[in-house]
Amino acid sequence: AVTTSADTIGATISEYAVGSMMPEKEGELGGHLYIVEFLQTDVSQKQLDMFGETLDGELIKNNEDYKAHRSEGFGLHAPVIFDVPPGSFNAWMKKRDQLGGQHKVPRIINDHDLFRNLRSHMGHSSA
């Protein structure tokens, strides 16, 4: 889904990670935050919006559970896309002494502390 979405906007992803965004207030929906590093430095907001819409559509099409949670505002809002400059993930991995060797950027981060650390490093402050 991520690659298809990048192809739609003519961009190439070098790294990405996704984690959950918990509701902050009563009645809010949760969702997922995709932190994405493109090889290109000129990805526009319009392209990011298209990337997010395509990603959401691909996930709905290919994942019945996701589709059920996205239907009629039940449980999940559309994915939030946060793009970061090239080299951002390498800097984060280096900061954690995880750059190189067998270490890879985790794609799906279920550890809330680790995801909070990544968001903080990348400059994304919301839950």
Where in this protein do the model-derived segments appear?
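AMP-binding adenylation
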Residues: 1-127
